[in-house]
Amino acid sequence: MFSHIMIGSNDITRSKKFYDALFAAMGAQPGTEDARGRLAYSHNGGRFMVTKPIDGKPASHANGGTIGFVMKDAAQAEAMHKAGVANGGRSIEDSPGVRPHGAYLAYLRDPDGHKLVGVAR
């Protein structure tokens, strides 16, 4: 459905540390940086990118927005969550676990405040 998802960051070096750890927990490679300083990650056929805003204004998170990553199982979702928290993210909402609809969800925010979730169905 999407070619990529791109989010803004106020500190690309901090974001690289955070997302490299997050994607490693998902079994993906570290991000690559292009000539413009944008980070790119590949996972399950999709691309996730991080950049400083092109307009030069501070990056901000989407109020009401969530970026969900497909996990192969609950253990991978838990590993993603732990890696994120250990690298500057913070756990949010309920603790990682199975929700009433049967999916295992692990919510956290990245260092810039973007809401992320690892989802194992």
Where are these regions (language model features)?
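Hydrophobic pocket/interface hotspot
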Residues: S15, Y19, A77, G84
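Core segments of cupin and vicinal oxygen chelate
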Residues: I7-F48
